[in-house]
Amino acid sequence: MKLIGRLLLYVLIACLVVIFGFYFLLQTRWGADHISNWVSENSGYHLTFDVMDHRFSAPSHLLLENVTFGRDGQPATLVAKTVDIGLSIRQLTAPLHVDTILLQDGTLNISVQTAPFPFEADRLQLRNMALNSPGSEWRLSAQRVNGGVMPWRPEAGRVLGNKAQIQLSAGSLTLNDVPATNVLIEGSIDHNQVMLNTVGADMARGALTGVARRNADGSWVVENLRLNDIRLQSDKSLSEFFAPLTTVPSLQIGRLEVTDSSLQGPDWAVTDLDLSLRNLTLRKEDWQSQEGKLSMNASEFIYGSLHLLDPILNAEFSPQGVALRQFTTRWEGGMVRTSGAWLREGKALILDDTAIAGLEYTLPENWKQLWMKPLPDWLNSLTLKKFSASRNLVIDIDPAFPWQITALDGYGANLELVQHHQWGVWSGNATLNAAAATFNRVDVR
């Protein structure tokens, strides 16, 4: 019996020696190479790492250093200096579902072509990582990313999974060519719906904060968005600048606030903009609203040859159209003031009271062509119910027949200036007088 006991003891000691030898061998470069080769040869993935570290002070954690992981024949999905895998008792029933995974000092590529990771975690943590999404609808590049995803259950084309809570911060981020710094995002993913409970960032020398939701059909609901002290320069025309708004099925704006911001493009600019918008839904090239409101003022607005100073606009939106409560601006040395309504039915703009005073306006060289050109679909008719003009100067520098009218005054009522998308004086009455005029270099008084 003593002999059998000794044999069992020797066998046990030998097994322990082999186990410990194998344990320490796995933590060498030789062990890392063999594990990497075994995974690469027996799966559809390629894996490399320099060394695996395990410490008895943290027995539930495995540490991999200088890790590269991805699908065979494709660029690496993950490159990280350190991967810390937290194990739990779950590994007895689900070996590929771990407690935590910490990715540190590396790059994670997210795209629809990305192959699914073969493992899951209750929590994925990122520390000083870079995120890229090449080839996806959201062109994303982020650096110095920290945060977490809970739970993390990646699928094909969805590195973050189908349902998870997200909390991320980034030192710098570029989304669809728009750069930002000090970014904070808190929200959730529920299949194709993305909820952004908190969004904050520094961008264009200003700040952005908001709450938004992306629905499964690709439409957006912006509950609240604030832009403060933005100084943005763009190389896009005004129509190109707003073109992304027409690419989504719809954009519902609950509340938009813009404060002390300046935007500039190649042929347009607005400075010192303050804007407040409520309850407006944009759908392709149309809009809908229930009790919507717009208040806006700026120091300067430029669009092509149009140059407005100190414009003020207050309007209300409804299913019937737009109630223009106030529009005032300084233009061409004078003042323009009006109010009225745009009616969706008939696409008619009716201005109740329009006043133009102190204008010094030189007609553009192609004003005759502009006069004959059809107007946009949204403007079928224009009627001035009440009109007044005071001390205006109008000049035409056409060398074939130059003319100018000085100190032009006038008033009118029910003037229909647009009919069927065409300029003209179609109906109404008006009285005009001037202190002096010159027609083809002939003075008239």
Task: Give residue spans per PLM region.
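N-terminal Sec-pathway targeting helices
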Residues: 1-17
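Elongated, acidic membrane-bridging lipid-handling scaffolds
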Residues: 89, 99-190, 195, 203, ...
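Terminal hydrophobic membrane-targeting helix
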Residues: 19-115, 152, 175-180, 206-208, ...
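A cross-kingdom feature marking solvent-exposed beta-strand/loop segments within repeated
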Residues: 179-184, 193-200, 206-209, 237-243, ...
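Hydrophobic residues embedded in beta-strands of well-ordered beta-sheets
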Residues: 62, 194, 208, 220, ...
